[in-house]
Structures are given as structure tokens and as C-alpha cells.
Amino acid sequence: MKILGIGVDIVENIRIHKSLKNVNFIKRVFSSSEILLAKKITNKKSFYSKRFAAKEAFSKAIGTGFRENLNFKDITVINDKLGKPSFVVTDKIKKIVKKRFKISSFNFFLSISDEKKYSVAYVILQKK
């Protein structure tokens, strides 16, 4: 197993909090499943900030940023029953990774954290 990419991003939570006042920002950046889940969450600022950082870190891990026809909504962050975060790997993401790295079998690993003013995400892309 080989590490193909690493991405990290830090977000100032207040910046995302201000952006949340713009409905177009939410619709442009977050998937419908993330928006639905956010409605059940008390601390929306933290929820959205951590996911924004995760999406940025993801784009850095694959080495393209938001190019190659990749946009924020293509990346959905989910949590398992214990709260461990991960990504929904869509066919579009598989295609981008396959084209960029010439592989078809891979894993993403995601770690997210926040502390008062900041949220941070760390992503590793690994060949299986």
C-alpha cells in the first residue's frame, strides 16, 4: 500500500459562519445529504466548517484542487455509527483518481477536528 497524496486544510470558523447567511453558498458547497443532516445538528457553524475543511483537504490530497471538473458538491463527508468521518466515493471521484494516478483501487482516510476559532481536516489517499 502506497500513499499517493496528502491534503490538509484549516478554516477560520467565523468565515464559514458568515458565509452560511448566503443560501447560495450552502447550495454550491454542500451536498443535499449534508444539508439535510445539518438541519438536525445544533452547532451548524462547526458542522459546516469541518466539512468545508475536509473538502479542501480532499482536493489537495488528489493533487488537483477544484479543477478537473471537480466541485465542492462532488465531495460528501459522512460519519459512521461511532462518528468516524469518511467520504462518499462517487463514480466521478473514481474517474478523477483513476485518470490522475492510473489506479482503480484506493482508500481515503479523513481526520477532522475543531477548536473554538478553527476547524482542520487531514486527508490521505492510499493505493490499495
Curated annotation (Swiss-Prot):
Enumerate the residues binding Mg(2+): 9, 56
Look up the domain of life of the source.
Bacteria
Reported EC number(s) for this entry are 2.7.8.7
Q: What cofactor does its activity depend on?
A: Mg(2+)
A GO molecular function assigned to this protein is:
holo-[acyl-carrier-protein] synthase activity
Using the UniProt record, name the top-level EC class of this enzyme in a single word: transferase
Question: Which residues belong to the signal peptide in this entry?
Answer: none
InterPro entries found in the cross-reference section: 4-PPantetheinyl_Trfase_dom (IPR008278), 4-PPantetheinyl_Trfase_dom_sf (IPR037143), ACPS (IPR002582), Ppantetheine-prot_Trfase_dom (IPR004568)
Q: What is its main location?
A: cytoplasm
Q: What is any one of the record's Gene Ontology cellular component terms?
A: cytoplasm
Tell me, what is an example of a GO biological process annotation in this record?
fatty acid biosynthetic process
So what does this thing catalyse?
apo-[ACP] + CoA = holo-[ACP] + adenosine 3',5'-bisphosphate + H(+)
Q: Where in the cell is it found?
A: Cytoplasm
- UniProt keywords, alphabetically: Cytoplasm, Fatty acid biosynthesis, Fatty acid metabolism, Lipid biosynthesis, Lipid metabolism, Magnesium, Metal-binding, Transferase
Would you identify the family this protein belongs to, as annotated?
Answer: Belongs to the P-Pant transferase superfamily. AcpS family.
The record describes the protein's role as: Transfers the 4'-phosphopantetheine moiety from coenzyme A to a Ser of acyl-carrier-protein.
Q: What is this protein called?
A: Holo-[acyl-carrier-protein] synthase
Instruction: Give the originating organism.
Output: Pelagibacter ubique (strain HTCC1062)
